[in-house]
């Protein structure tokens, strides 16, 4: 089985047991900018559940022009507040 096939099968299993629908705006009104480090599960690290936050990931966990665009949409259209933005850089990234 290819990695793509495995991911598609995992997605199908997830969809079968998904307890939704969840509203599009995050329930905790928080947006997190995080490093794309595959070792880090941002939701678990921060104690978040599905639907509670927007997680925006990129190399270095820094706010770039693209990050600003994503944060602006998160705030203006989907209700996160500026004071709740957080960055979670990791060591050795």
Feature locations, PLM:
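Short, conserved "active-site rim" segments that organize catalytic pockets and cofactor/ligand binding
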Residues: 1-63
């Amino acid at each position: 089985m290819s990695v793509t096939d495995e991911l598609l099968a995992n997605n199908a299993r997830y969809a079968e047991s998904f307890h939704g629908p969840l509203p599009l705006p995050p329930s905790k009104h928080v947006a997190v900018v995080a490093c794309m480090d595959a070792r880090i599960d941002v939701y678990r690290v921060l104690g978040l559940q599905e639907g509670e936050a927007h997680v925006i990931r990129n190399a270095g966990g820094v706010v770039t022009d693209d990050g600003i665009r994503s944060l602006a949409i998160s705030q203006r259209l989907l209700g996160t507040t500026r004071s709740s933005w957080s960055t979670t850089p990791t060591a050795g990234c």
